[in-house]
Curated annotation (Swiss-Prot):
Comment, domains: Ig-like C2-type domains 7 to 9 are sufficient for interaction with NTN1 and commissural axon outgrowth. The transmembrane domain is necessary for interaction with DCC.
Domain Fibronectin type-III: 885-982, 987-1086, 1091-1187, 1191-1285, 1379-1473, 1474-1575
PTM: Phosphorylated at tyrosine residues. Phosphorylation is enhanced by NTN1.
Disordered: annotated span: 1718-1809, 1920-2013
Polar residues: bias regions: 1949-1968
Gene expressing this chain: Dscam
InterPro entries assigned to the protein according to its UniProt record, in alphabetical order: DSCAM/DSCAML_C, FN3_dom, FN3_sf, Ig-like_dom, Ig-like_dom_sf, Ig-like_fold, Ig_I-set, Ig_sub
Segments on the Cytoplasmic side according to the record's topology features: 1616-2013
UniProt-listed GO biological process terms: axon guidance; camera-type eye photoreceptor cell differentiation; central nervous system development; dendrite morphogenesis; dendrite self-avoidance; dendritic spine development; homophilic cell adhesion via plasma membrane adhesion molecules; locomotory behavior
Boundaries of every Ig-like C2-type domain copy: 20-119, 125-216, 225-305, 313-401, 407-500, 504-592, 596-685, 690-783, 787-883, 1285-1377
CDD domains recorded: FN3, Ig, Ig_DSCAM
Name used for this protein in its record: Cell adhesion molecule DSCAM
Species of the source: Rattus norvegicus (Rat)
PANTHER family reported in the protein's UniProt record: CONTACTIN, PROTEIN SIDEKICK
Length: 2013
């Protein structure tokens, strides 16, 4: 097999790489300028780089690659350009002040950097100076540092000095960005100092100090503004901060107004007016324009006008950013430019500029678009867009990646052998860009259409071309080498392989071949047929190969000729194929060798312009004919060039008769023949002799100025210009000019002299040469003109006040010269009497003298003499100082201490003579200066001194003198000062500690002794630390203010049960005194903070677990360990929790005994101290060990045929482990044979075959665990029968399932024949067949399936099986578990930081409650927190709540099914309210002249700790408040440093967590003599004419409007009240109807006796309640708030039977003993959500707090239960003459005499007057421990249908008409509580029960309905059983009874009832018995047993209470 693949590619320059990681980039693209000092040199790294490493080169801007100049310039291998330090004489513009650029090149391409201007700065001397300034006191002064223009660009101001002290920008001194010094609010003393600026050269680092300047300060005088600082133009880049100075001097202070482009400028945002002028932040180009600063006051105006130029930085961006294309495609690039306009844009490719050409187009505005067509591979690389404007430039680049679009073979056919007539398909898969064209050949012959070959192709989704060649029936001639060729503009690729067709071998005729000499040639032998033996080649009968250039491939018949030679290789070649050993065939081919041309190399010699050129191109070898052509620069030579070409045979000549510059270029000679085309290229360079473009001419130069001597020339090569100089005007003797920093040659050849001096005058010669032709030169004469200059003058001079002074200056320059004298800015005229000016000429100089007669202080300052001529002006500044004795210093107190006083003085005018010393005098205030203590000759360098050894609090007088060389000053101002206080010398007294809690200690103490206080005690520092005898702990310090002589402070957040040491220190203004003696105490004990660790539990037996744990550390105990408590409970299999138990021990281990076998237990351990239980540990789980199981719970056996029986059983009730198997025993007595059969643990039936017919067998079953066999079940007998009756092996029982699951009820029946099975469900006591639908079906095995089980699927199901011989039935009780109902959540107790919640669980949904989730949120907050709560809990206390804050709560119960409904949101508020100030307390304790003591005891914290105390005060009529903010409130607070005899405003703000309170007050300090000042008077000024008519009318209209408004408000209140009443009545009626609807629609049928019915609950909102119960000896007040639950069944029954009073009895589980208040409702809000609270009706205003009062007495143990009666105010039916006795029931009913009744019962508190209060009291009465076994009777009032105000109860003879105070809305009229039943007496021997009140002591309120369905329960005996069964099993029927079942009264009950009542009861009982269905006694007993759970059923029994249609009573048991 063979495969030959050849690739032919076009020839491209290898300048591009497709390496994926090849890239170029810039490391510092912003580098555009490098300035350096000539003395230091510089290193300039190339800004470009790349990966892989790049080649870096540097070029001049002209494109010339730079070269190393030893010692001057060097390019390092890493591309860094170094310029070496050099002296000024070696300065070269070409090197040291030129533009460079750098290139980086790698296979990715080539990029060039932006132009980098490199400039060397020569070191030249310069001076900076500052001029004296004038200003007015209180105004602004501006000093400027004047820098010479020659160095201004390099020198910056770094600081200013005042005398020798550096100034920093601050409140009064400001240094601007331009280096100016601003002095704000100038004072006289500012004129006493010298000011100078310090500059630094940016590049040389040299610093210069200016001369000293003075500030002359004058008194303010009215004057027009004069500009001190301004600007004429500013340049900035966008984004920079711009400062435009504008400052003027004037009085009054002038106003500033800014205009931009003649429009007022709005000063806001980015534009800000500052002290210095205008500040522009983040400048923009739009900010450019003309700015005017107008300065004006009432005396005149001034302006500063300037322009601002904000330039946008140039930025170029090329898009697209990534260019990836292919060869032959078009590429378009766009360059977007931001920044200045009119910029120049150019394109570069690989560092070379791009010009428009054949395939290159540059279009768009400013040439922004580059379009390149027909891209070739050399076009790839880096493309750059350069933008240039002035000296700014920017660039961007992008790499253009050209993919190799050369075709590539992806997959192709392979060599194969086929048989004749066999179809052949060849495939060639090719890719390339552009899409290649595929052609096919067979043995180098094209395959044509119709030749038996079919060619087709397709393009895949990947862009590949797939070409197919198909041969439907191959023949021998179809064999050969097939080649597929793919061709596109990028290249060609081919693939070939041989296809052999079996058949006789032969050779297809071969075509002659033409070979090219010097190249390789392949000759293929075109063999067809297969197989054959060999292929051989011959030439001239010689077997090939016979030399090294010949290679014969015998396997495929190919001959290769390398480096073909015409003489050797041309000729006949024969291919011989050996077909059989003795048979061969052959074919010959002729090879002709063609020789390509070879051009003899030629080069252009050096030619000059105008010469003639003749260049021959000779082809020295190659086959004829040969064609020769010429090209210039790659294109045909245009005829316009005048070039002549002569061709003769194998030669061609190029002739140019007259050379010019346009002939420059590359000339190429191209020779072609049949073999090839070759070329040779040479460059023609035409040289041009130099000539002048600008010739030098005579010029004048001004001394000190710059001059340019023009001279420029052109030529090729670029000519060199050399300058020479001949000094003077004589015969020129030219010498080369030494170039330096002052004299430079410009790039155009001109000569620059930066600073002309007199020696520069003379002849200058400009010589131009370029080695082409003769040099040219031209001379010129430079004349130097000298401007007027001051050559001599004194810089400074001194004069003595009152004496004569002369000053002179000398001028030099071109005559005539005028000299003028100035003083400051005033010209000195001859009219000035004290000044005399004289001038004289001495040679070339002019001397001028100024005389002053005599000198005064004002003569001090700067005088200047000005010299002026035609060429310039100069001036000399002379500083005259007039000396005199100094002014006295201004002294002030710098620091006062207890025993030292430090003075500070400011020296006034020093008399222009240095101060030589100071004298200080100090005396007691009462002494004379003669006895003063003096300190002389204090150093003049000092400006402060300290006086020592003074007495604290003593008063002294101090003054001082200044001295200089001239004399002594007058005495200074006299100051009087009192020494400071000293720190206390004694500790606080009587320090006592008292622990108040486990984390707090109360500290009390008294102030130090008076004589040791050393001032006013202002506060104390308390230091405390944990006390340790061996430790050295640092004290924690707390600072507090003083409140009086005795202090109290409580330390909080301390460690529990920890010993602390404490000290107290007193503080005054001077500091802190000594500490008190350290006192030790210990915080109180607390519960442990952490649980025991490492709790481990191991099961030791089936009934015991061993537990161990680690003891707690001392830090975690928080007290003395009393022991450990282990809490444990069983986790039952069904997910329920067992009883929670706990065991106490003192050891860290415990053995739990008596546990359930093989049961998983949850275990927690806690430690407890004397303070209580600590934190429980995390639950751990341990299972007891296995034991032998109990007996199976049941066994059944039934005959299935004559020889086979089935046995079924139930698992043991006590598994005691994992059941491994069951063993079934079968035996018969005759003979005794016991057979054992094993069944798997998950099997509960077994088939026993092969039994004898009609023989009885004994069967029993045993369960087996890993511990062994358990006890056997009961033994049953069974007999195989041929006619086996139907029997059911499944057991009856209860099936429990969660809702929404699929449930299968099994019913396995056996018998012979097989029995039929049917299912029925008990419906209202009557079984009926189950409904078969999509949710219910019966399997073939008899099982009944219910899918997605629901609550209504609960009930009793019967499975009946029967056949011909018998039947059987089982009953399955299906219980469906649902999520639990919502709990009933109430608030039971509140404190200032905690809220205790209690709840009653709702219906558990058939599954025990697993836990609760309590959620809470602070009011007005959307954030909710949550707590998981144990299922056994019924209350929860939330700690660490905010005081006086409302909170919202919800509770959710969870059972095995999931979470239930969320309870209603209830709200509660922690105790506390905002602070308030007591009116009985006086705010101001004491007031004197400068101090006020505030009495803060009057602030009541409202029960919540004060969190902040803010006090502000200010003098009356001012706007600035003085603030004192504290976090704690002390007893008193002292305001210090007040102004005497001043009225003050005072406002206080005190806050706690409940809110804030404010208090305002005014007070006045006393006069200095202790007298008071006049009070504040607000005067009202009224005109004498009195009120006008219009004013009187206005008052009348105002009063009328107020009266009308009050009237409207009163009417509105009446309407709102009536509407609220109507809405309230409507809501109650709606609640009634809703309850009836819920009763009828939402009743959940319950077939399970142990489960209470599920009902929809409604929330009841009861804001307040009050319950009154008297006790004979004591009275206890219990605050209460609760929620009432009534049921819709009750409400509905009441609606149906209004004429009856129905009593319901409910079992209620007792709660724990309560000894304190049940709940505090003083801050309760109505409603369970914020909207309800806001809309609730306000309660009675007469009382602020409600009390629930219980009167409890202890019953005698032998007292029997009393009869419960409804205790209406109606007369009780009795015999005539009977005496009323107080009822033994607890009753509350409406009272007519409300005021009298309440007063007699509640003392000063009002009794309840609303239904809500009684309903809440009733709810919590049920929860009281004392009433756990009491009976409650409720009488409920309903709305009268007749809307009557009178409620009637019974007949007329029993009617008691209620007054209008009786409520006309529904509610509980009363409820009563009676002692327990006799059988409960033993359990309540020591329990208190309530005593009933009189009928008049009643409280009334309406009911809020929340319905629970109530089930009836009968009385003992037949009627009771029937009632119970009816209520539990047939609830629907129980509601259809005409009358409820009533119990017969007990003897005690009968004694309290009337005869008519008993008759009514008997008649009702008869009716009830007649209608009740009969049930089996066992079932009723079971039902009674189930109903005793905590969620007990409610039963109804009636008591006939007369004919009152609006009352019914409820009795709860």
């Amino acid at each position: 097999m063979w495969i030959l693949a050849l690739s032919l590619f076009q020839s491209f320059a290898n300048v591009f790489s497709e390496e994926p990681h090849s890239s170029l980039y810039f490391v510092n693209a912003s580098l555009q300028e490098v300035v350096f000092a000539s003395t230091s040199g510089t290193l300039v790294p190339c800004p470009a780089a790349g990966i892989p490493p790049v080649t870096l080169r540097w070029y001049l801007a002209t494109g010339e690659e730079i070269y190393d100049v030893p010692g001057i310039r060097h390019v390092h291998p890493n591309g860094t350009l170094q310029i070496f330090p050099f002296p000024p004489s070696s300065f070269s513009t070409l090197i040291h002040d030129n533009t460079y650029y750098c290139t980086a090149e790698n296979p990715s391409g080539k990029i060039r950097s932006q132009d980098v201007h490199i400039k060397a700065v020569l070191r030249e001397p310069y001076t900076v100076r500052v001029e004296d300034q004038k200003t007015m006191r209180g105004n602004v002064a501006v000093f400027k540092c004047i820098i010479p223009s020659s160095v201004e660009a390099y020198v910056t101001v770094v600081s200013w000095e005042k005398d020798t002290v550096s100034l920093v920008s601050g409140s009064r001194f400001l240094i601007t960005s331009t280096g100016a010094l601003y002095i704000k609010d100038v004072q006289n003393e500012d004129g006493l100092y010298n000011y100078r600026c310090i500059t630094r050269h940016r590049y040389t680092g040299e610093t210069r100090q200016s001369n000293s300047a003075r500030l002359f300060v004058s008194d303010p005088a009215n004057s027009a503004p004069s500009i001190l600082d301004g600007f004429d133009h500013r340049k900035a880049m966008a984004g920079q901060r711009v400062e435009l100075p504008c400052k003027a001097l004037g009085h009054p202070e002038p106003d500033y107004r800014w205009l931009k482009d003649n429009m007022p400028l709005e000063l806001s945002g980015r534009f800000q007016k500052t002290v210095t002028g205008l500040l522009i932040e983040n400048s923009r180009p739009s900010d450019s324009g003309s700015y005017v600063c107008e300065v004006s006051n009432r005396y005149g105006t001034a302006k500063v006008i300037g322009r601002l130029y904000v330039k946008q930085p140039l930025k170029a961006t090329i898009s697209p950013r990534k260019v990836k294309s292919s060869v032959g495609s078009q590429v378009s690039l766009s360059c977007s430019v931001t920044g200045n306009e009119d910029q120049e844009l150019s394109w570069y490719r690989n560092g070379e500029i791009l010009n428009p050409g054949k395939n290159v187009r540059i279009t768009g505005l400013n040439h922004a678009n580059l379009i390149m067509d027909h891209m070739v591979k050399s076009d790839g690389g880096a493309y750059q867009c350069f933008v240039r404007k002035d000296k700014l430039s920017a660039q961007d680049y992008v790499q253009v990646v050209l993919e190799d679009g050369t075709p590539k073979i992806i997959s192709a056919f392979s060599e194969k052998v086929v048989s004749p007539a066999e179809p052949v398909s060849l495939v060639c898969n090719v890719k390339g860009t552009p899409l290649p064209t595929v052609t096919w050949t067979l043995d180098d012959d094209p395959i044509l259409k119709g030749s038996g070959h079919r060619i087709s192709q397709m393009i895949t989704s990947e862009g590949n071309v797939v070409s197919y060649l198909n041969i439907s029936s191959s023949q021998v001639r179809d064999g050969g080498v097939y080649r597929c060729t793919a061709n596109n503009s990028a290249g060609v690729v081919l693939y070939q392989a041989r296809i052999n067709v079996r058949g006789p071998a032969s050779i297809r005729p071969m075509k002659n071949i033409t070979a090219i000499a010097g190249r390789d040639t392949y000759i293929h032998c075109r063999v067809i047929g297969y197989p054959y033996y060999s292929i051989k080649w011959y030439k001239n009968a010689n077997l090939l190969p016979f030399n090294h250039r010949q290679v014969a491939f015998e396997n495929n018949g190919t001959l290769k000729l390398s480096d073909v030679q015409k003489e050797v290789d041309e000729g006949e070649y024969t291919c011989n194929v050996l077909v059989q050993p003795q048979l061969s065939t052959s074919q010959s081919v002729h090879v002709t060798v063609k020789v390509p041309p070879f051009i003899q190399p030629f080069e252009f010699p050096r030619f000059s312009i105008g010469q003639r050129v003749f260049i021959p191109c000779v082809v020295v070898s190659g086959d004829l004919p040969i064609t020769i052509t010429w090209q210039k620069d790659g294109r045909p030579i245009p005829a316009s060039l005048g070039v002549t070409i002569d061709n003769i045979d194998f030669t061609s000549s190029l002739r140019i008769s007259n050379l010019s510059l346009m002939h420059n270029g590359n000339y190429t000679c191209i020779a072609r023949n049949e073999a090839a085309a070759v070329e040779h290229q040479s460059q023609l360079i035409v040289r041009v002799p130099p000539k002048f473009v600008v010739q030098p001419r005579d010029q004048d130069g001004i001394y000190g100025k710059a001059v340019i001597l023009n001279c420029s020339a052109e030529g090729y090569p670029v000519p060199t210009i050399v300058w020479k100089f001949s000094k003077g005007a004589g015969v020129p003797q030219f010498q080369p000019i030494a170039l330096n920093g002052r004299i430079q040659v410009l790039s155009n050849g001109s000569l620059l002299i930066k600073h002309v001096v007199e020696e520069d005058s003379g002849y200058y010669l400009c010589k131009v040469s370029n080695d082409v032709g003769a040099d040219v030169s031209k001379s010129m004469y430079l004349t130097v003109k000298i401007p007027a200059m001051i050559t001599s003058y004194p810089n400074t001079t001194l004069a003595t006040q009152g004496q004569r002074k002369e000053m002179s200056c000398t001028a030099h320059g071109e005559k005539p010269i005028i000299v003028r004298w100035e003083k400051e800015d005033r010209i000195i005229n001859p009219e000035m009497a004290r000044y005399l000016v004289s001038t004289k000429e001495v040679g070339e100089e002019v001397i001028s003298t100024l005389q002053i007669l005599p000198t005064v202080r004002e003569d001090s300052g700067f005088f200047s003499c000005h010299a002026i001529n035609s060429y310039g002006e100069d001036r000399g500044i002379i500083q005259l100082t007039v000396q005199e004795p100094p002014d006295p210093p201004e002294i002030e107190i710098k620091d006062v201490k207890a025993r030292t006083i430090t003075l500070r003085w400011t020296m006034g005018f020093d008399g222009n003579s240095p101060i030589t010393g100071y004298d200080i005098e100090c005396k007691n205030k009462s002494d004379s200066w003669d006895s003063a203590q003096r300190t002389k000759d204090v150093s003049p360098q000092l400006n402060s001194a300290t006086i020592i050894d003074i007495h604290p609090s003593s008063t002294y007088s101090i003054r001082m003198y200044a001295k200089n060389r001239i004399g002594k000053s007058e005495p200074s101002n006299e100051i009087t000062i009192t020494a400071d206080e000293a720190a206390p010398d004694g500790p606080p007294q009587e320090v006592h500690l008292e622990p108040t809690s486990s984390q707090s200690i109360r500290v009390t103490w008294k102030a130090p002794k008076k004589h040791l206080q050393n001032g006013i005690i202002r506060g104390y520092q308390i230091g405390y630390r944990e006390y340790s005898t061996g430790g050295n702990f640092q004290f924690n310090i707390i600072s507090i203010d003083t409140t009086g002589d005795s202090e109290v402070y409580t330390l909080d957040n301390l460690n529990k049960f920890t010993q602390y040491g404490l000290v107290v220190q007193a503080c005054n203004r001077a500091g802190t005194g000594p500490s008190s003696q350290e006192i030790i105490t210990t915080t109180l004990e607390d519960v442990p903070s952490y649980p025991p660790e490492n709790v481990q539990a191991i099961a030791t037996s089936p009934e015991s677990i061993s537990i161990s744990w680690s003891t707690l550390s001392k830090e975690a105990l928080n007290g003395i360990l009393q022991g450990f408590r282990v809490i444990y409970w069983a986790n039952l299999i069904d997910g329920e929790l067992g009883e929670i138990k706990n065991v106490t021990t003192t050891q860290p281990s415990l053995e739990l005994d008596g546990l359930e076998k093989y049961t998983n237990y949850s275990i927690q351990v806690l430690a407890f101290t004397r303070a209580g239980d600590g934190v429980r540990s995390e639950q751990i789980f341990t299972r007891t060990k296995e034991d032998v199981p109990g007996p199976p719970a049941g066994v059944k056996a039934a005959a299935a045929s004559a020889s086979m029986v089935f046995v079924s059983w139930l698992p043991p009730l006590k598994l005691n482990g994992i059941i491994r198997k069951y063993t079934v025993f079968c035996s018969h007595p005759y003979p005794t044979v016991i057979s054992e059969f094993e069944a798997s643990p998950d099997s509960f039936s077994y088939r026993i075959p092969n039994l004898s017919r009609n023989r009885q067998y004994s069967v029993w079953v045993v369960a087996v665990t890993s511990a062994g066999r358990g006890n056997s079940s009961e033994i049953i007998t069974v007999e195989p029968l041929a006619k086996a009756p139907a029997r059911i092996l499944t057991f009856s029982g209860t099936v429990t399932t969660p809702w929404m699951k699929d449930i299968v009820l099994p019913c396995k029946a056996v018998g012979d024949p097989s029995p039929a099975v049917k299912w029925m469900k008990d419906s209202n006591g009557t079984p009926s067949l189950v409904t078969i639908d999509g949710r219910r079906s019966i399997f073939s095995n008899g099982s009944f399936v219910i899918r997605t089980v629901k609550a209504e699927d609960s009930g009793y199901y019967s499975c009946v099986a029967n056949n011909n011989w018998g039947s059987d039935e089982i009953i399955l009780n299906l219980q469906v578990q649902v999520p639990p109902d919502q709990p009933r959540l109430t608030v039971s107790k509140t404190t200032s930081s905690s809220i205790t919640l209690s709840w009653l669980p709702g219906d558990n949904g058939g599954s025990s409650i697993r836990g609760y989730i309590l959620q809470y949120s602070e009011d007005n907050s959307e954030q909710w927190g949550s707590f998981p709560i144990s299922p056994s809990e019924r209350s929860y206390r939330l700690e660490n709540l905010k005081c006086g804050t409302w909170y919202k709560f919800t509770l959710t119960a969870q059972n095995g099914v999931g979470p239930g409904r969320i309870s209603e949101i209830i709200e509660a508020k922690t105790l506390g309210k905002e602070p308030q100030f007591s009116k009985e307390q006086e705010l101001f304790a004491s007031i004197n002249t400068t101090r006020v003591r505030l009495n803060l005891i009057g602030w009541n914290d409202g029960g919540c700790p004060i969190t902040s105390f803010t006090l502000e005060y200010r003098p009356f009529g001012t706007t600035v408040w003085t603030t004192a903010q504290r976090t704690s409130l002390s007893k008193s607070y002292i305001l210090y440093d007040l102004q005497e005899a001043t009225w003050y405003e005072l406002q206080m703000r005190v806050c706690n967590s409940a809110g804030c309170a404010e208090k305002q007050a005014n007070f006045a300090t006393l006069n200095y003599d202790g007298s008071t000042i006049p009070p504040l008077i607000k005067s009202v000024v009224q005109s004498e004419e009195g009120l006008t008519t219009n004013e009187g009318l206005k008052i009348l209209v105002t009063i009328s409007c107020i009266l009308v408004g009050v009237l409207l408000l009163f009417v509105l209140l009446l309407v709102v009240r009536r509407r609220r009443r109507e809405q309230r009545l409507k809501r109650l009626r709606d609640a009634k109807s809703l309850a009836e609807m819920l009763m009828s629609k939402n009743t959940r049928t319950s077939d399970t006796l142990s489960k209470q019915q599920q009902t929809l609950r409604m929330h009841i909102d009861i804001p307040r309640a009050q319950l009154l119960i008297e006790e004979r000896d004591t009275m206890e007040t219990i605050d209460d708030r609760s929620t009432v639950l009534l049921t819709d069944a009750d409400f509905g029954e009441a609606a149906k039977q209004k004429s009856l009073t129905v009593t319901h009895t409910v079992h209620y589980q007792s709660v724990s003993q309560a000894t304190g208040p049940l709940v505090d409702v003083s801050d309760a809000r109505p409603g369970t959500n914020p909207t309800t609270r806001r809309n609730a009706k306000a309660g009675p205003t007469a009382r602020n707090r409600y009390a629930s009062q219980w009167t409890l007495n202890r019953p005698h143990p032998t007292i029997s239960a009393h009869t419960l009666t409804t205790d209406w105010r109606l007369p009780t039916p009795r015999a005539t003459g009977s005496v009323d006795k107080e009822s033994d029931s607890y009753s509350v009913s409406p009272s007519q005499d409300t005021d009298r009744a309440r007063s007699s019962m509640v003392s000063t508190e009002s009794a309840s007057s609303t239904y809500e209060e009684l309903a809440r009291a009733y709810e919590h009465a049920k929860m009281e421990e004392q009433l756990r076994h009491a009976k409650f009777t409720i009488t409920e009032c309903f709305i009268s249908d007749t809307s009557s105000e009178q409620l009637t109860a019974g007949t007329n003879e029993y009617t008691d008409s209620l007054t209008s105070s009786t409520p006309s809305e529904s509610g509980i009229c009363r409820f009563t509580a009676s002692p327990p039943k006799p059988q409960d007496g033993g359990r309540v021997v020591n329990m208190a029960v309530p005593k009933a009140h009189r009928p008049g002591d009643l409280i009334h309120l309406p009911p809020y309905l929340r319905m629970d369905f109530l089930l009836n329960r009968g009385a003992p005996g037949t009627s009771r059983d029937l009632s119970l069964g009816q209520a539990c099993l047939e609830p629907q029927k129980s509601r259809t009874l005409k009358r409820p079942t009533v119990l017969e009264p007990t003897p005690m009950e009968a004694s309290s009832s009337t005869s008519s009542t008993r008759e009514g009861q008997q008649s009702w009982q008869q009716g009830a018995v007649a209608t009740l269905p009969q049930r089996e006694g066992a079932e009723l007993g079971q039902a009674a047993k189930m109903s005793s759970s905590q969620e007990s059923l409610l039963d109804s029994r009636g008591h006939l209470k007369g004919n009152n249609p609006y009352a019914k009573s409820y009795t709860l048991v």
